[in-house]
Amino acid sequence: MAKLPARAGESFALRVRLGAAEIPAFALSVHDHNPLHHDQAVARAAGYPGLIASGTQIGSMLMALTATHFAQPLEDGTPRNGLGMGFDIRFRAVVLADEDIDLRWTVTSLERKDRLDGWIAQLEGDARSQRGVLLSATGTLLLWLGQRAAAPA
């Protein structure tokens, strides 16, 4: 059987918690000045228990999880890596400060693309808290094994 950089059904996850200091720091770093991310009083007046995270924060963490996972070698030590080619993220509920959030991806398909010297992986993912789904996502990645001789065109 040919060695593959991933398998359909492969899942990976990470639990994170965004603190009340982390949320405004990230929002400022991406120039998101919405006061719901910076001002407790404004967030409470809007009906939230406190600060809510910028969508870019939890979305970027979910996307980064794919990069981290596929940069890890296979169980037999074979190096692998990948690049994100596209992500579609749908926000379902706000992310509150200081709640546990489970980020999860599952590979749904893998197709060899000789022109790109790799495989196109399709993934489905989400972020959940005890309140339910916070966001859902799909992703398309280019994966490869070993070291690349040249960057894909």
Predicted regions: what is each one?
Residues M1-A53:
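Catalytic strand-loop segment that frames the active site of acyl-thioester-processing enzymes
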